[in-house]
């Protein structure tokens, strides 16, 4: 179709418009669904704690979540700034090596914060919340490990987005949501808030590794190999 706007002729290809519209719909739907799934399964533990354990456990667990994941914004900021270079890179092997370097950087920065929480967590809890919240210490340490896995998961997530894996992400997050509900229930019932924290680690680990390895002939597996089997 020919359109004239301000004296200029424009040819509008209806087939291309349909193609790009479908692509944008699928891409947007994938990101929205995966984002909702992430938000949901990160809150499942709190809901199940309230139902299976007690309201006080929810309060203690909320403190553990707040402190154990409080440093996550640092790694997220680092990932966001680093990925502009990765997205602009056309060579797959170079992209994998850049993502692997970012993976290692996020890993070691996360280890630093985990060490701070491990050695200073009890003092921080007593200072901020009082001795009645000391029971949040072990879940807090476990959740800091979960936050490390989540940060590494963001590196993989962004790498999948680079290769337009929006539909894959939406399916993966939906599957993880279905897995997390029974897993959290069976761990929370006998172990309470510690079980809730353990379920977070298990879910984040499965999401980071096995589930991602199905994408694009194991490109995430190759990135992980480059991260920890080959150094700078």
Model-derived regions, located:
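Alpha-helical transmembrane segments of polytopic membrane transporters and translocases
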Residues: 30, 45-47, 57-75, 105, ...
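Membrane-interface helix-loop junctions in multi-pass transport and translocation proteins
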Residues: 121, 126, 174-209, 221
């Amino acid at each position: 179709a020919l359109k004239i706007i301000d004296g200029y002729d424009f040819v509008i290809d209806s087939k291309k418009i349909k193609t790009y519209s479908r692509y944008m719909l699928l891409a947007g739907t994938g990101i929205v669904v995966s984002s909702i799934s992430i938000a949901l399964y990160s809150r499942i533990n709190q809901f199940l704690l309230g139902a299976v354990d007690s309201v006080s456990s929810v309060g203690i667990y909320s403190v553990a979540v707040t402190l154990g994941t409080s440093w996550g914004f640092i790694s997220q900021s680092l990932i966001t700034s680093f990925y502009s270079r990765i997205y602009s890179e056309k060579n797959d092997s170079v992209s994998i090596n850049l993502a692997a370097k970012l993976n290692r950087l996020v890993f070691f920065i996360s280890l630093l914060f985990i060490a701070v929480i491990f050695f200073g967590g009890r003092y921080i809890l007593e200072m901020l919340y009082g001795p009645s919240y000391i029971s949040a210490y072990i879940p807090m340490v476990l959740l800091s490990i979960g936050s490390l896995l989540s940060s590494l998961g963001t590196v993989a997530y962004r790498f999948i987005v680079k290769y337009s894996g929006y539909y894959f992400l939406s399916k993966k997050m939906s599957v993880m949501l279905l897995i997390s509900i029974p897993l959290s229930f069976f761990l929370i019932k006998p172990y309470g808030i510690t079980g809730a924290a353990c379920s977070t680690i298990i879910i984040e680990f499965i999401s980071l590794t096995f589930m991602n390895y199905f994408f694009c002939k194991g490109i995430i597996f190759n990135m992980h190999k480059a991260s920890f089997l080959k150094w700078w």
